Amino acid sequence: MYYPLSSSLMFFILFSLFYHLPCESSKCESLFQCGNITASFPFWGGDRHKHCGHPLLELRCDQNKSTSLFISDQEFFVLHVDQTSYSLTLARPDLLHSFCSLTFTNTTLPPEIFELSPAYKSVTFYHCYPVLPDLSNYTCPVIGPISVSGNPEDHETCFPNFAANVPTSFVTKEKKLNIANLESVLEKGFEVNMNVIMKACQACSYSNESCGFDENFPFEVKCKPHHSPTDTSLSIGAKAGIAVASVSGLAILLLAGLFLCIRRRRKTQDAQYTSKSLPITSYSSRDTSRNPTSTTISSSSNHSLLPSISNLANRSDYCGVQVFSYEELEEATENFSRELGDGGFGTVYYGVLKDGRAVAVKRLYERSLKRVEQFKNEIEILKSLKHPNLVILYGCTSRHSRELLLVYEYISNGTLAEHLHGNRAEARPLCWSTRLNIAIETASALSFLHIKGIIHRDIKTTNILLDDNYQVKVADFGLSRLFPMDQTHISTAPQGTPGYVDPEYYQCYQLNEKSDVYSFGVVLTELISSKEAVDITRHRHDINLANMAVSKIQNNALHELVDSSLGYDNDPEVRRKMMAVAELAFRCLQQERDVRPAMDEIVEILRGIKDDEKKRVLVKSPDVVDIECGGGDDVGLLRNSVPPPISPETDKWTSSSDTAASL
């Protein structure tokens, strides 16, 4: 039957389409303003949309009207912006106060965006033993003597600690630094020049357009038209072209709206007919008798509420999992009233199927293309994986469902995060042996994924579930990627959770297995410290747990990092094992991904730590400074002794828990 499109509906469609067009383009005409800082291209932030500037150059304004820029995993205060010379003055917040109180880190900026002004120079701070008289020296109360050089030389007794930028005039003719004024100089910041393509931006201004960037990688400058309804500078030909284009666009939109309206009505009728005529039967390529409540989906229908996932319903070889109706999952979850928490791209609810199985049902936040792709991605990855430490996917809803839902086994004991620093931590804290088992099982699951060519990309303690026996179930594969075996990396925009993202992936947009290794290093640090990966209530140098851990280990202060309630202070055996795990975490958290261990090696190291009852555990690391954590029983960090890695079997697995997870 033909249904004419009502005039009110057509007006709404056209209005909604055209109403927002001038708003988006006009946002690029807005300036970022904060205190005494005013900026335009290539920056964005505030009233300027992200597409109006370089994706990495977001300016932020705090309550004190101070402007900041977060780039290369470091925060910088923006003291001055010169749009004429395309330069700006930056200062590190951690250098604005007492020099000796900071956690030493290098000043790093992406060279494709910034270059240090010729008026400034990078100087290196050293630890020298003994102190060399030909270098400027400065003594910090806790750290001890620090030597500074504007022109570093090869001193066998000196080890570089970190680098910072100072004016060239600060370096004397004798190539030494006037260290007495070091703090005041660092507070004034340093100047950098922008390397982004400014000529392309000038070309935009010639055509009365605004500068912006596309969302592809590598980023390219794009000219975006201004919105100016009163602009009379257009030629008659240009105006005629615009008029013709507008009329053509209007005609296309009218036809498209008419087509969509008719199609939606037909789909609604087809869906109603299908739901009434289909019998209740089993649908599972693995077990045809396990759940009598599932629904057989008709493969003869050619219509789809979501065409991008239409083959989920009529291709059992695509899903390989059971297909549930929306109504039975709505009933199982008591109308989605028993919320368990967030699950990456959806909310997770507790439910009980008619056959008695307890399940966790993930409900998509929204039906955007990105969410649908994550929905499909999780099914595609989990359907073919079997491992005792990976969560089991029972099934999903069909294309005729009102909403997209995923159905998993229910893991009753919460997340690892809840047990380490959440609402379960105080009631029954995890003992050290349990934490070590959790580390081994998580590493085993990741090693299995890497063997299968899969990068998880979002390993964190909230995605590590625990059953009643504290056996690990790694979950949430919405961001996971299949990794081609013949490639060294995948170029993709960084995704993941702050505090867990590999800094090299963040800076270079290159993803590989070692990105998971870095995230796992953060998890190891949480296991030994019971601290959150990111905690803004900590000292500003310790907000990021990974940075805090590396600093504490490098400065022989592991006792300030670990959870003393685990027996670190009074049990020598626990102390040695915790130090060995800390050493392994230190290797995983290295900035250079090439020096991080592979997951199969990590599994063997952790098993060696668990099985060692009397020997001191030593962990090797190539070309990393040898640091000892003080004390007679301390183990030297990162020495050259480690069991040789072996290739894990893909079809035989051992678990540190005696009992499998109960459903």
Swiss-Prot record:
Q: Which Pfam families match?
A: GUB_WAK_bind, PK_Tyr_Ser-Thr, WAK_assoc
Membrane topology recorded in Swiss-Prot or TrEMBL = Single-pass type I membrane protein
Q: Which residues lie on this side of the membrane: Cytoplasmic?
A: 263-663
Q: Which residues form the signal peptide?
A: 1-25
Where in the numbering of this chain does the Protein kinase domain appear?
334-609
Q: What is its EC number?
A: 2.7.11.1
Q: Name one GO cellular component term.
A: plasma membrane
Keyword terms, alphabetized: ATP-binding, Cell membrane, Glycoprotein, Kinase, Membrane, Nucleotide-binding, Receptor, Serine/threonine-protein kinase, Signal, Transferase, Transmembrane, Transmembrane helix
Q: Show the active-site residues.
A: 458 (proton acceptor)
Compositionally biased intervals (Low complexity): 290-304
Spans of biased composition, class Polar residues?
A: 653-663
Give positions of region: Disordered.
Answer: 282-304, 637-663
Assigned protein family: Belongs to the protein kinase superfamily. Ser/Thr protein kinase family.
The identity of this protein, by name, is: LEAF RUST 10 DISEASE-RESISTANCE LOCUS RECEPTOR-LIKE PROTEIN KINASE-like 1.4
- Protein's organism: Arabidopsis thaliana (Mouse-ear cress)
